[in-house]
Regions:
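Phosphate/pyrophosphate-binding loops and the adjoining catalytic core of nucleotide-dependent enzymes
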Residues: 1-177
Length: 177
């Protein structure tokens, strides 16, 4: 009989994933996700939790990852739902065994904020600003100063964009909102 991984929790308990995603077992799942992506997990800590008791839990983690090109600080997210994965969870990696299913993603590839992966990179933001003619001229990624103001995983993100002595705030929302 195959041993059940600790990160799956006890069958029938912790349906919303709160215990798993806020406890030390989250590290095992994070390690599996990082290795699946081609890296090695150096260390990690819980960053943020959004809980809907009995329904779902989403957590983010700050992680130091050793990639083939070097070590980087990364932000990972995980979600578990009592009712099983949502349609948008298919945009993340799903770890499954038995009844436990956990969606895992690396920022900015939030499964409920598909626009975030476009807004979070200077190259993509330069194209948006240029296409919308927001500063009266085409801009390059080198002209963009971009930083995250706030991020609520699976809900919204706000970024500050500075270019040509102008400042813009970009809010990324879920589809249909």
């Amino acid at each position: 009989m195959r041993r059940r991984p600790a990160w799956l929790g006890v069958p029938g308990k912790d349906a919303d994933g709160a215990v798993l995603l806020t406890g030390p077992e989250a590290g095992e799942l994070l390690k599996a996700a990082v290795e699946h992506a081609g890296g090695g997990l150096v260390d990690w800590h819980l960053d943020h939790v959004d809980a809907n008791p009995g329904q779902s839990t989403t957590a983010t983690y700050q992680a130091r990852v050793q990639w083939p090109a070097g070590e980087r600080q990364e932000l990972f997210g995980m979600s578990a739902r009592a009712s099983g994965p949502a349609v948008t969870d298919s945009r993340a990696d799903i770890y499954v065994d038995g009844s436990r299913e956990v969606a895992v993603w690396r920022y900015p590839d939030d499964p409920d904020l598909p626009g975030l992966s476009r807004a979070a990179y200077p190259e993509q933001m330069a194209a948006i600003i240029s296409d919308l003619n927001l500063v009266g001229a085409r801009v390059s990624a080198q002209q963009i100063n971009l930083h995250m103001i706030g991020y609520r995983p699976r809900r919204r993100a706000v970024l500050c964009v500075e270019v040509n002595n102008r400042r813009f705030y970009v809010k990324v929302l879920r589809e249909g909102i």
